[in-house]
Structure formats: C-alpha cells, structure tokens
Amino acid sequence: MTTPSFIPSVNFHLIKPCNMGCKYCFARFNDVASKSLTRGGLPKEDALAVVSALADFGFEKITFAGGEPTLYPWLTDVIELAKNKGMTTMLVTNGSRLNEAFYLRHAGLLDWITVSIDSLSVGTNLAIGRAKHGNQVFAREDYEVIAAMIHDYSYRLKINTVVSRYNHEEDMNDFIAHAKPERWKVFQALPIVGENDEYLEEFEITAEEFQQFLGRHGSQAKLVKENNDEMRGSYAMVDPKGCFFTNVNGQLEASSPILTVGCDAALREMNYDLTKFHDRGGRYDW
C-alpha cells in the first residue's frame, strides 16, 4: 500500500450544537450561521455527499465530532456510508447520549467510540462546563459504566482528556487503568481566537504544568500527548458547512465548500502539515 501524501484521517464536525458548554471548546463554530444549516449541520444528502467525497479522495479513517455528534439526526446514515466505503469509523462524544440502543444500532458500523473525559470530579466538571444543560454532571462512576459498556458491546475505546487550569493537578491513573482504553489522548487546552478566548485566563496552562500532568501519568502505556504546537495544523478537519478548516494560525480558517469545488481543490487551500501528523503519532493501528 502506498503512503498517502496527505493526512489520511479526517475529522468531520457534523453539527454545531452541543448539550454541554466546556469553556475551552475550540469547535463552537461561532462563524457558522445556524440558519444556513439543518439543525446545526448539513442536510442529510449533503452530509452523505461530503462523506462520499472524503472516502473517494482516499481518507482512510473518519472521526465524527461536533458539537455533540449524537445530536445529529442522520448520524447512523453517515457512519454506515463511511463504513461501507471502507473507512475506519470513529465517534467523539461527551457520552451523555450513549445507551444500549445506540450500541446495538451501530454494531458493525462504528469501530471506535472516543469519550471526552477531562475530570472525575463533579465539581471540576461543573467548573469546566462539562455538564449536560449546564447542571447534569458525570461522576467517576458514570464514566466507569460508559467504558464498561463500550467494551461489552465490542467497540474500541479511546479517551480524550483536555488538561487545563481546572484539572492539571488531577490524578487519573487508577481510572485509566480500570477503563482500559486502547488509546488515551491527552491535550493541552488550546486557545483559539473567536472560539474560546473569552475564557483564556480561566483555562490556559503553561508547558511546564502540562508536562507535570504527563509526568504524573507516565506509567500509562496508552497515553499519547499533544501540546499546543503539536495540535496546530496536524489535523484534517471538516466543519458543519462541509468546508475543510485549520487552526494553524490560532483561529479557525475555512476552505471553499467541498461540494462546490471538490475535495482536492478544497484541501489544497489548507496548509495541513503531514510531518506534524506523523510526529504526533497520528498514524496508528486503527
């Protein structure tokens, strides 16, 4: 198999809305006018066409994100199409809408479920804004149940943790050891102009503080870290309007719509960094 000359995995942020309000979220898409979208995302046929274009171009893995992607009414349809076109399929979710019906419905279609878990403390999650409708907060026990069910239904589990001023002193070793994710991505909270900079003083941490969190969890073999520099420009991402976008300059900048100019032309408008993608461990056994 030839090695692609472009980043071979893509994140499709299907939908703008979310049922939580994490202060350091970089994907609020404040420039996306909801009135131009159906329920905050592309209409079904357009979303399917974007997925088809991405698959036909040669992307090998697609991660459906948001907002909160489980709010997207045609989530199953886009996952099924991606799977049928031979892509590895992944979902990034806050876990609030995962249940037995979801696991059964997506069996054989969805390969990975990534759960965003920043803290095991109710108080910390509330401070972060990781609370459903602002007040329904997950505790450690809730996350343990989610992880167990993902394993029980034979999905591959990944956990994403954003390290910020709120949680940088936390110890998650025992939880991670019990949750047994195949991959634990640990991100330094990333400031993005126009998305989360209003809360910058609340969540921003230094490189040293991030390193201290990593050092505390150095025994976790599945940990993959990403600091601010490693994150910028190393992801191929599609926004809820069906445009590629990048964060390389510290703000979100979008391409022309994929369905208007085609995947190749839209991708050429971006300055994604394939070397950075590989350096951060972006290619793995997916």
Curated annotation (Swiss-Prot):
**SUPFAM superfamilies associated with the record:** Radical SAM enzymes (SSF102114)
Annotated binding of [4Fe-4S] cluster, by residue: C18, C22, C25
Per its record, the protein catalyses: GTP + AH2 + S-adenosyl-L-methionine = 3'-deoxy-3',4'-didehydro-GTP + 5'-deoxyadenosine + L-methionine + A + H2O + H(+)
For the Radical SAM core domain, which residue ranges apply? 2-223
Record EC number: 4.2.-.-
**Is 4Fe-4S among this UniProt entry's keywords?**
yes
| EC supergroup of this enzyme | lyase
Q: Which GO terms describe its molecular function?
A: 4 iron, 4 sulfur cluster binding; lyase activity; metal ion binding
Q: Does the keyword Hydrolase apply?
A: no
- Please give the Pfam families that the UniProt record associates with this protein: Fer4_12, Radical_SAM
Q: Write down the SMART domains for this protein, in alphabetical order.
A: Elp3
The UniProt keywords, alphabetically, are: 4Fe-4S, Antiviral defense, Iron, Iron-sulfur, Lyase, Metal-binding, S-adenosyl-L-methionine
Required co-factor(s) are: [4Fe-4S] cluster
Q: Which GO terms describe its biological process?
A: defense response to virus
UniProt function note: Expression of pVip21 in E.coli (strain MG1655) confers resistance to phage T7; prevents culture collapse upon infection. Catalyzes the conversion of guanosine triphosphate (GTP) to 3'-deoxy-3',4'-didehydro-GTP (ddhGTP), probably via a SAM-dependent radical mechanism. Overexpression of this protein is not toxic in E.coli, thus modified nucleotides do not affect bacterial transcription machinery.
Sequence similarity = Belongs to the radical SAM superfamily. Viperin family.
PANTHER family for this protein:
RADICAL S-ADENOSYL METHIONINE DOMAIN-CONTAINING PROTEIN 2 (PTHR21339), S-ADENOSYLMETHIONINE-DEPENDENT NUCLEOTIDE DEHYDRATASE RSAD2 (PTHR21339:SF0)
Official protein name in the record: S-adenosylmethionine-dependent nucleotide dehydratase
Q: What organism, scientifically named, is this protein from?
A: Lewinella persica (strain ATCC 23167 / DSM 23188 / NBRC 102663 / NCIMB 1396 / T-3)
